[in-house]
Each structure stands twice: as C-alpha cells, then as structure tokens.
Amino acid sequence: KYFYSIFIKKIIMKYLTPLEMLYKWESEKPHSIYLSQPINGIWHEWTFYEVGQEVRKMASYIKSLNLDKSAKIGILSKNCAHWIMSDLAIMLSGHISVPLYPNLNKGSLNKILLHSETQLLFVGKLDDFELMKGGIPSELKCITYPFYSQNYLIWDDCIKDVQPIQDNIKRS
C-alpha cells in the first residue's frame, strides 16, 4: 500500500497544469504557433509568446477589478482561441472558470449565472446571441472577444495599456 501511494504521487507530480504547460512552451518555444483559427475566412495565429502576453495582461486586468477571492468568471462562447486564453487568464488571476454551453436559452443562462454567483462574463463566438443576452443580469460586467463585438468592453481595449503579470504563478 505504501509503495502504491508513492508510485501514484510520482505519476501525478509528472503532470503539469495548463498554466505550467503555457509557461513551459512560452519559454522553450516562444515563436511556435500555439493557437490558430479562421475568422471571416482569414486565418489568425498566436505564438506561445503572444498567447502568454495576452493571458498575462488579461489576468492583470481581472485582478484590477478587485473581484471576490476565487470569484466565478463565466465563459460564454463556442470554441475559439480567446476561449482558451480567457480560461488561462482566469486561472492565472486566481479565480474559477464557469464554462457555459453556447446554446443555452436565456432562462437557463440566467439561472446558471445567478446560482454560480458569476462576477464577470466573457462573451465570444455565438450563433444567436440575441436569443441569449436577455439571460445576462444587467449589472454583470461583460467582456467580448475581438472579432465578436456584442456591445461590451472589448478584450483588446481591456489589455491595451495593462502591464502583464510577470510571475509564473502556480495553482493547484
């Protein structure tokens, strides 16, 4: 039993968290492409360094909002590069991601946002946001991803003049 316990701990300790993987590739292969996606027929690419900088800046911006400790932050979007970046920024800032299905109706969306006590919401690529937006409480601060303007604060504007977090913070 003792041997098994040590064996399991050694196996678990070899795995890196998503943030630790970002730090690793950010330093080892900064100019390699990490994320790419087509937007309006044009491919956009982000290197590990570029993703690291956006994540670090957004994490710094999130920290500047002085949210409650371990605040819940929602992500309402189909899969896209900024979904990954916002999830990493939430982790880096010390908060908790609340991923939301991109096809929720407004009633379900509202219940989840209220029940989870979400304090900030990222809004991105969605098929029919007009049917969903009524479920977002009016007092909830929202940030929209570039390329998907939903009349909220825009990601790029939020991080434009922000200093990135320099430390490689570890979360468990």
Segments predicted by a language model, with ranges:
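A short N-terminal helical cap/helix-turn-helix that marks the beginning
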Residues: 13-34
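Conserved AMP-binding/adenylate-forming core of the ANL superfamily
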Residues: 34-80, 84, 88, 105-110, ...
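Conserved residues at the C-terminal ends of beta-strands
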Residues: 36, 119, 124, 145-146
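Structured binding elements
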Residues: 94
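Conserved ATP-dependent adenylate/AMP-binding module captured primarily in the ANL superfamily
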Residues: 102-134
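ANL superfamily adenylate-forming
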Residues: 127-172
